Amino acid sequence: MSSIDINEADVIVLSEGLKKLDSLYSEMSQSLKKISSTTSTASQLFTPILKKNQQLNILQYNIESSLNSVASVKDLANDASKHEIILEQSIAKVGLKPYINAIHKIDDILEDLNERTHSNDTSEFAGMVTHLKELIFDGERNLQIYFNKLLNSIQPFDPQINMNKKIPFPYYDDEYLGQMSLILDYFENSTQNAQIVDLFIKQRVRLISQSLAFLEPFTKQISSGPNVPYQKGSSGVNSYTEAMLGFIANENSLIQDLYSKETSRQPVIYAKLCSPIIQNYLKIIRHNRQLLKDNRENIGLFSFELSDKVNDVLRSLRGKDIAEADYLNSELIEIQRISHSLFQELFAYINTKTRSMSQLPSDNGVPEPTVDIMSKIRKFSEYKSGCLSTIQAMSRSQWLPKDPKISWTITKNQLEDLSSANLLSSFFGDAIDYLLFGLERRAQETLNPQHEIHLLSNKRFPNIQRIGFFLLNNLSLIDQIVQRSEINSILGSAGLARLESLRKKYINYYVSDWRDLTSILLDQIFVDSSGKVSSKEKDQIKEKFKKFHDGFEDLVSRSKSYRISDPALKKILRQEILSLVLPMYERFYNRYKDSFKHPRKHIKYTPSELMNVLNTIIK
């Protein structure tokens, strides 16, 4: 055996160790590869499991969160279902207050739902939110339908029937008013408030318009024909205006009842409601004004009535902010211009009619012009109210004719009083003055064509007694018409005093010849200091008696031909003649009756006999 070097032995041992180590390392490397392969496979297998697990964790969280959310709104859903049951029924069945209360509750639940979920869109409960909103929408729509039904409980009607029977226009009872107020209160702070107010206005305007439509056809014409004079009160505008004012008053009350808690809104709603009604009324007024303008001669007096109606409407709108009122006032001004012309035209008409009288009536009575003119003046007086409102913008000079020969009976006090009532009294007094002036002028022109016309002076003129009698007869008729018509109240005490002044003037005309007769009996002193009458003076006394008797019998004969139908005038004239003639004759008779040896030879009448004759002359 050979010996081995120790170092070599170490190398051999180390080399063997390295071989073993290399083999081990190779085995470890193979094992690690297997482990790596196995780990990779395991990793591939666990990745979807982890994802699923993560998804399950998320799902578990969502389920738990949803369960928590459902638990949090479960009470709201239960509460909402109770109120939904109410809203699914009719208002008439469940009652208005419970119905409105249910809508409020649903609205509160919706608001609470938003707060609990801390989300503005409440997306996880979008279906529930949508359903609640739909419930509120449907509920409010049903309220509007019910409100409309309440409004329509009063349907259009013919207001003329109610006015004829003096029945008030239909109005809602307290229950309906209360229900409508509840609905309006509900919508007060709602976005649909304007919509419910518009519904209210629309339905009320519809009711009024369709009701007034029954009367509107009668406003299209003023009289039954183009040449037919207007009869007071016959225009359909009167009924239309009366009905419209009734409706307007009703609407004012209704708005106050429904908006009693919101007084500031009342004028606004009233104006919106009335505006279309007044607009249609304006069309009617304009149409009638044009008719007046086209046929003033026959229907002109209607302008006073129309003015009254327009004034009534304007008074009802006073203080209300309604733009149409200004247009209506402009129409009133135009109508009153037509009325102003009627005042002037009446005097032109009087002048034309009196000048058309060709001669005095054979009985010295009332001619056709007097009857016609007084009829026109009487008709004028029927429109007292309209005349008063029209004349306040006029002066007396606007109707007086430019004729210097006229002696007006108006007093200074009347001239200074510029009130409407006094101006109207002056107008009617002037018209009567002008009528009698025209009659007197024509009487003098026809009876005394060769003589100057005396109208302003107190000079005597031919046929003065007959003319006086003629004028007294006419004044008697005028007086009767005055007493039986509105002229009496229009004239008043000052105007009636003017008639009395005319009566005295014409009585003086009538007794003028009697006054001349009595002047015969005015004597100088015929009796001497011894109480005797000289033969020369006796002849003068005889002549005076004879002249008086002749004149007396002539006047008696003439006076007996006059027929007086007015008992009051008979009495006045008889008294005037007796008081004028009898005292003078009695004085003269008593003074000279004993101057003659045979008195009856020269003295035809004793005072009592004279009085008996005088009593027979006025028939």
Swiss-Prot record:
One Pfam family, short name = Exo70_C
Q: Nucleus as a keyword?
A: no
Q: Name one GO biological process term.
A: protein transport
Name the source's superkingdom: Eukaryota
Q: What Gene3D superfamilies does the entry give? A: 1.10.357.60, 1.20.1310.30, 1.20.58.1150, Exocyst complex component Exo70 (1.20.1280.170)
Provide the primary localization: other
Q: Where in the cell is it found?
A: Bud; Bud neck
Q: Which UniProt keywords apply?
A: Exocytosis, Protein transport, Transport
The record's section on InterPro entries has: Cullin_repeat-like_dom_sf, Exo70, Exo70_C
Q: Give the record's GO CC terms.
A: cellular bud neck; exocyst
Recall the GO molecular function terms of this protein's record: phosphatidylinositol-4,5-bisphosphate binding
Protein function:
Involved in the secretory pathway as part of the exocyst complex which tethers secretory vesicles to the sites of exocytosis. Also plays a role in the assembly of the exocyst.
Q: Report the sequence similarity comment from the record.
A: Belongs to the EXO70 family.
Q: What is this protein called?
A: Exocyst complex protein EXO70
Query: Source species, please?
Result: Kluyveromyces lactis (strain ATCC 8585 / CBS 2359 / DSM 70799 / NBRC 1267 / NRRL Y-1140 / WM37) (Yeast)
